[in-house]
UniProtKB/Swiss-Prot annotation:
One example GO MF annotation: oxidoreductase activity
GO biological process, one term: mitochondrion organization
Keyword list, A-Z: FAD, Flavoprotein, Membrane, Mitochondrion, Mitochondrion outer membrane, NAD, Oxidoreductase, Transmembrane, Transmembrane helix
Protein known as: Uncharacterized FAD-binding protein C17H9.12c
Topological type in the membrane: Single-pass membrane protein
PANTHER family, sorted: NADH-CYTOCHROME B5 REDUCTASE, NADH-CYTOCHROME B5 REDUCTASE-LIKE
UniProt-listed Pfam families: FAD_binding_6
SUPFAM superfamilies in the cross-refs: Ferredoxin reductase-like, C-terminal NADP-linked domain, Riboflavin synthase domain-like
Length: 266
């Protein structure tokens, strides 16, 4: 080793040590960052805004505490699971939008529902843990030239998400509680010009509500019909899902004489 190289050695070692320390600090710093939304482990989100719609239903706007790239390329209809860590219970929820910077949920509180009660106990600034996203169905909704959706209550959420991602006409039969307006109807129609909403209130939905629409050019045999709501509602409209697996079950109920090309129960 030459004398000049020997004299430079402390500087070289110091530079290497500095680089190593910087790399170690970066790794340590990033190891302490909370995870972004992912399907494997729960990630923390901050409750950014709560908008009360009724005494038992609100919009919850959640923002990730770390970047969540998984939502940028996902196709509808997608869902996440939310858990109450104190009880180790979880439940799937469908966000209204697929936005990497914010997830907005339409959630109704049920006294017998531990997760919905947990979410409604939160205040702006609190943390809620999410995991996902997951595909709700393998059905390719984008290939149908027209979609008819029959929904009740918070069952509007998957259709809200879907309507923003397809160019096809989406005609929605929206059944709401007696004396209660169809929540988010005006927002959905404003945001999605391809959407028409027919509100059914204070009575039972009938087959004419589903089939009778003006200015329809797509044959029913080419139309996708989606039914979304409580188990009882889905069963009344299209028959129950199969008791095992993720099978759809036979189409019965109000749609027993099924005129649609495809009926899908969510």
């Amino acid at each position: 080793m030459s004398s000049s190289t020997y004299r430079k050695l402390p500087k070289i070692l110091a530079a290497g040590l500095a680089i190593g320390c910087a790399g170690g600090y970066y790794a340590y710093k990033n190891s302490n960052k909370p995870p972004g939304l992912n399907p494997e482990i729960y990630a923390p989100f901050t409750v950014n805004k709560i908008t009360e719609l009724t005494s038992d239903a609100s919009l919850f706007s959640l923002v990730p505490q770390s970047p969540s790239e998984h939502l940028t390329t996902l196709e509808p209809i997608a869902k996440v699971t939310i858990r109450d860590p104190s009880m180790q219970v979880q439940r799937p929820y469908t966000p209204l939008y697929l936005d990497a910077n914010e997830l907005k949920f339409f959630i109704r509180k049920y006294e017998e529902g531990p997760v919905s009660s947990y979410i409604h106990s939160k205040k702006e600034g609190d943390t809620i843990e999410l995991r996902g996203p997951f595909k709700t169905t393998k059905l390719d909704c984008t290939k149908y030239p027209r979609i008819v959706a029959i929904v009740a209550g918070t069952g509007i959420a998957p259709i809200y998400q879907l309507a923003q991602s397809v160019k096809s006409p989406v005609d929605i039969v929206y059944c709401s509680r007696p004396g209660q307006p169809p929540l988010l109807k005006e927002e959905l129609e404003k945001e999605c010009p391809n959407v028409r909403v027919k509100s059914v209130q204070n009575r039972l939905v009938n087959i004419h509500d589903i089939l009778d629409w003006d200015n329809v050019t797509v044959p029913l045999k080419d139309t996708l019909c989606i039914v979304c709501g409580s188990q009882k509602f889905v069963s009344t409209i299209a028959g129950p899902k199969a008791d095992y697996g993720a099978r759809q079950g036979e189409v019965k109920g109000l749609l027993s004489n099924n005129p649609f090309g495809k009926v899908w129960k969510l």
